Amino acid sequence: MISQINNKGRDNKLEAYDYFLDPSLIASKPCAIRHESRLMIVRNSVLEENCLTNKFTKNLLDEFRKGDLLVVNNTKVMKARLKVQLENRTLVELLVLERSHECVWLCLAKPAKKLKINRKIILKSPYAQDINLMVDGVDEETGGRFIKFPENITDLNSMNDLLNKYGEIPLPPYIKNSEEESFHEKSYQTEYATNPGAVAAPTAGLHLSKSLISNLKKKGVIILPITLHVGYGTFKPIDQEDLSNLKLHKEWVSVNEEVVEEIKRIKKTDRKIIAIGTTSVRALESCYSHEINDYVPIAKYVDLVIKPGYKFKVVDGLLTNFHLPKSSLLLLVSAMIGRERLLDLYKKAIKEKFRFFSYGDAMYISPDSLLEKK
């Protein structure tokens, strides 16, 4: 196990998580075959030869043993981007985040200044009738707007039905290409996405093809789902330099009894628990109860912050993407292997032309490389 450098002061400064990335390395489309994306494997030494960069996601099959547990996030990205029209025909874009109360939903708006309280707006689609909405309030935390939808839009199922008629897949702004909407409807979902509720994809899962999943199961690797509906807490830019009291926007998490019992069983063996993506890490770590010192099923909103110094209670390893500078995701991965080492690995990835962000390549952090454990 690597000894952690005592650099707590720097670890709590946002600027310490910055790095330069040539825009040409930002992936605008996914790898044609999911499991053919490139893979950086991080081992238990800072020696360069223990960072493997000549692998592909399909080589994950060689990294896991029979009885290891892979935990995937089965959330499904909703068509959460809506285009609405004001009375003067001005267009405004909404991103539906979550239900506030009754038929009122929190949305990010662009440009938000156009949406004053009590202003009426019209949701339009060439395939369905117009729907009248109203601005019900302003959210101080996000700068978003509380939007009043029709009275029957009171849960995720009814909202998802509406979004399927009027909405678009909410791709990150750095994904710019000419692909049709139908292309992203498939490519920006994991193969196991079954639970609508996310406004961004759990992108590490995009690397797992049906054939790779099948081969992992044939090997005896256990694959179980949790749910974290990826929302504002995952992609919101951090706007404070001092990270010592960082808070994240809450996101809905569900970890069921089957997963918890499997965690308890595996913790008594030499097998490992591998999270597919940072959202799976946050969900799994949230199911550990400090009050009773045990793992418990959960179905609730969580706002867990994982940054350097955090001691992992559940997760042993991680498959993840290459993340944006100064992001909460970069903090989480830094908590696993150390900020300085992670940034050194990013420099290596940039030098070797790895593809970054949502549609980019992957990094696998092996269990023996984690810094902090319970």
From Swiss-Prot:
Functional pathway: tRNA modification; tRNA-queuosine biosynthesis
Enzyme class: transferase
InterPro entries xref list: QueA (IPR003699), QueA_dom1 (IPR042118), QueA_dom2 (IPR042119), QueA_sf (IPR036100)
Catalytic activity field: 7-aminomethyl-7-carbaguanosine(34) in tRNA + S-adenosyl-L-methionine = epoxyqueuosine(34) in tRNA + adenine + L-methionine + 2 H(+)
Single GO term (MF): S-adenosylmethionine:tRNA ribosyltransferase-isomerase activity
Keywords: Cytoplasm, Queuosine biosynthesis, S-adenosyl-L-methionine, Transferase
Main subcellular localisation: cytoplasm
Subcellular location: Cytoplasm
Keyword Protein transport set for record: no
Family recorded in the similarity comment: Belongs to the QueA family.
UniProt-recorded name of the protein: S-adenosylmethionine:tRNA ribosyltransferase-isomerase
